[in-house]
């Protein structure tokens, strides 16, 4: 049985998913998803403690994804990782309680440690 804390990372860029998993797999149970839709399914079938999502994705933004899951998974910590300056949407999401924190890309492994 795996007792590691579970983290879901959602990003449409495959190389980001690979890098994230490689950086954190020793300490955490890392689940990755290339889409928000797949991320929702992973949330429904796994005990996830932290969601980290990219802000800019094709089907919906990271903020929109977190808005979709906040009511079904209210106790899961939600963070946005972005390389862009979508600060208005992200700050609004933080202020409304949908997002705990945002981190800019490229991410620092020490900054992301839970």
Language-model features: where?
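As written
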Residues: 27, 62, 94-100
